[in-house]
Amino acid sequence: MASVQLQNVTKAWGEVVVSKDINLDIHEGEFVVFVGPSGCGKSTLLRMIAGLETITSGDLFIGEKRMNDTPPAERGVGMVFQSYALYPHLSVAENMSFGLKLAGAKKEVINQQVNQVAEVLQLAHLLDRKPKALSGGQRQRVAIGRTLVAEPSVFLLDEPLSNLDAALRVQMRIEISRLHKRLGRTMIYVTHDQVEAMTLADKIVVLDAGRVAQVGKPLELYHYPADRFVAGFIGSPKMNFLPVKVTATAIDQVQVELPMPNRQQVWLPVESRDVQVGANMSLGIRPEHLLPSDIADVILEGEVQVVEQLGNETQIHIQIPSIRQNLVYRQNDVVLVEEGATFAIGLPPERCHLFREDGTACRRLHKEPGV
């Protein structure tokens, strides 16, 4: 195991900057996930740690050693890519041992390492098979095993589940989580799938246009996003946003006017520092935090546009006339409602988020479970 530290790391190709002044501390044994939309720089950041991309400026440390100029083979890292990249003419055992053979390891060491890793990954009964005889999930386990036999200090995974179908992704996600708990290795995992990030990570790094938007535990990012970008990216369906105007402030409270014909006002339990009366802001509320109208004091009403019945839950898209945008309401179980019907939902102030015009969040003061 080893820690990884990035200090003011920047990557640029000519005048195009793809990673901007990145500062990160990844502790020994942590499972850290880099997540963000396509083009945000997450894979580039991983490749700089691996040594596959040079660092334009800043410093990278693995353990206590500065690694900027160290060749990839000497960094003590192992990498798994989206593509399995297995040799089709070699057996599972031969694929897993290929790197050790190139390194000149003794046969008994190779056999011991391959057999040990095969047991961990439940591949022992498949060691004699060729890749074409394996399922997608088994091939990905072989690719992971090939990296593990080299005993890297840091394990890097670049979107390893993207080529798998939905059921296999769930299965492999569970297996990777179990593998980390069993081995205790430092793992850095890249994905654009925020569900993978939420379920796997000890710590999530959200990237936006080459910058670190927020670093934190999964529930911390879900309940207390630092800005509107993180709020909209973490969570599915994504957070609803409403334009509001500040009408009053008090200690640890901000009153806003909702964009409804009755101009209803509501006090939100958020930090009021630097919030000015009359300011235009955005109120955020997650679909699953909206309430049935009969148990709420603050009511929003609109026309049902789309009803998505998922069996275990219902997602209702409601158009609010005064703002000409849809809100998504999510409720467990089946909700029977027709498209075109008028539908009312409740807005719980304590579950609301408030964002300034520059996108930064006013700190929420409501204590959420698990954070």
From Swiss-Prot:
One MF term in the entry's GO annotations: ABC-type maltose transporter activity
Pfam families: ABC_tran (PF00005), TOBE_2 (PF08402)
Signal sequence extent: none
Protein name: Maltose/maltodextrin import ATP-binding protein MalK
Membrane topology: Peripheral membrane protein
EC number: 7.5.2.1
Ligand binding (ATP): G36, P37, S38, G39, C40, G41, K42, S43
Organism ancestry: Bacteria, Pseudomonadati, Pseudomonadota, Gammaproteobacteria, Enterobacterales
InterPro entries: AAA+_ATPase, ABC_transporter-like_ATP-bd, ABC_transporter-like_CS, ABC_transpr_MalK-like, ABC_transpr_MalK/UgpC-like, Mo/tungstate-bd_C_term_dom, NA-bd_OB-fold, P-loop_NTPase
Species the sequence originates in: Escherichia coli O6:K15:H31 (strain 536 / UPEC)
Name of the encoding gene: malK
SUPFAM superfamilies reported in the protein's UniProt record: MOP-like, P-loop containing nucleoside triphosphate hydrolases
